[in-house]
Amino acid sequence: MKNSNKLIASVVTLASVMALAACQSTNDNTKVISMKGDTISVSDFYNETKNTEVSQKAMLNLVISRVFEAQYGDKVSKKEVEKAYHKTAEQYGASFSAALAQSSLTPETFKRQIRSSKLVEYAVKEAAKKELTTQEYKKAYESYTPTMAVEMITLDNEETAKSVLEELKAEGADFTAIAKEKTTTPEKKVTYKFDSGATNVPTDVVKAASSLNEGGISDVISVLDPTSYQKKFYIVKVTKKAEKKSDWQEYKKRLKAIIIAEKSKDMNFQNKVIANALDKANVKIKDKAFANILAQYANLGQKTKAASESSTTSESSKAAEENPSESEQTQTSSAEEPTETEAQTQEPAAQ
């Protein structure tokens, strides 16, 4: 992990947090800058910066952080945060301090961001567990491929990858020998085992391997490395595939992990979880400058949806009273054709 852009994209800059937090530690008239004939107060600074994109994002993150800390604060330990912090530091190596500095972060502000992320992660996983229906299990089973044994070549250059693929296609080519010679992985590792739910192998590589029969060799697979932002190129050969059992319950534990992992990556699902937490916290925006920071979560929370549905029902009832003939026509139409909900109810639920 040698590129500091990942930090920039994933955390709030220290400067933006300071722009907002300054108002908490001092009053509006506190002078933060003085000069000949003029001063700049906290209020001046706040009004100047609050409409900027970075401050809008900072406020959103601050709200989410406070809400999830209040609701799930006891679910994430200091040890977990420290572990994640040191793992990131190890991945960046010697460039970690520079990456933090470039993002205007200190170790402590970065740890706070890690904690906030983990609190949301916990809430999302807990919500995902409630989605574990028989239908979800069966759906996951349909696309599931059990453990595969593969040989994989990892390369840094597309032209080299294409050349290696041609070499592999030659009659009598020894995939294992060529793989060990050409791969750029540490210690020349080429043998792997994983199933279709693996997260330690690039998704496109997993998909390609899952689609192959035993002995099959993939084309060159191009993958953008999310840590280095550099492209990697893969060629895989499936050497063995476990036979898939007919009963999905044989894989229930594994399917559970896959379903939860997929929902945890689903931004729409994440937003619903955040929206529900915001609803529960009864968040109210007091400054119009920040009126739209929660727009992406509007109408996603359970309370918000219920209020919206209640409002719609009330408006429909009022309209029916004002237009009785139209209401009667609607009722007649509804009696002739089942609603979507009724149509679904008429069929037995999947078991």
UniProtKB/Swiss-Prot annotation:
One of its GO terms (molecular function) is peptidyl-prolyl cis-trans isomerase activity. It is found in: Cell membrane. Residues 145-240 form the PpiC domain. Disulfide bonds: none annotated. Residues 303-317, 326-351 have a biased composition (Low complexity). Its EC number is 5.2.1.8. Residues 303-351 are annotated as: Disordered. The keyword Isomerase applies. Its main location: membrane. Coiled coil: none annotated. It comes from the Bacteria. It holds the Pfam family Rotamase_2. It catalyses: [protein]-peptidylproline (omega=180) = [protein]-peptidylproline (omega=0). It is a lipid-anchor. Residues 1-22 form the signal peptide. InterPro entries: Foldase_PrsA, PPIase_dom_sf, PPIase_PpiC, PrsA_foldase, Trigger_fact/SurA_dom_sf. A lipid is attached at residue 23 (S-diacylglycerol cysteine). One of its GO terms (biological process) is protein folding. A lipid is attached at residue 23 (N-palmitoyl cysteine). NCBIfam families: PRK01326.1, PRK12450.1. Plays a major role in protein secretion by helping the post-translocational extracellular folding of several secreted proteins. Belongs to the PrsA family. This is Foldase protein PrsA 1. The gene is prsA1.
